[in-house]
Amino acid sequence: CVVEKGSEVGAHILSGAVFETRALDELFPDWKEKGAPLNTPVVADDIYWLNNDKKGTKIPGFMTPKTMHNDGNYIVSMGNVCRWLAEQAEALGVEIFPGFSASEVLFNEDGSVGGVITGDMGVDKEGKPKDSFMPGMELKAKYTVFAEGCHGHLGKELIEKFELSKGQSPQHYVIGFKEIWDIDPAKHQEGLVVH
């Protein structure tokens, strides 16, 4: 099963992306026929060196690193891709529980991970049960995949308990910004990726 803290799968995925289809081709070779939301193929890549806050220099194509050539890739909304993947998973029998977050790791008697416990619902600001109280559920699993982001509280607990960072370089984090720009339609070129 999948526990999704958002109201629906994809609710917290705001990013657009340039999407390479290799993994999708392997999972769902008929993804086009199934209506995957990959509708805008990349037609060109432009890369600019920003000289200052007013001017940039376009890098010639022959100087563009191979990894920045997006031929065969698509410009997508990752929220839409995640929603579509959820539909495919449900069609294969995967149970998805939107609106629930994993609040605790469920450990087996031998100390191994045995699943998660979802958060209690129907509690007030002080954490006291209201009339609508529903205790968290124990979701037991042979395998548990934690996908809560780069600095999730359960991940931190597991890193500490199993000493996963022992002898490793510390993780580094940066702040990213997501913006939606309104631009003059005359300046828009469908399928153009600008770096």
How would you label these PLM feature ranges?
Residues 1-56, 63-195:
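Residues forming the flavin
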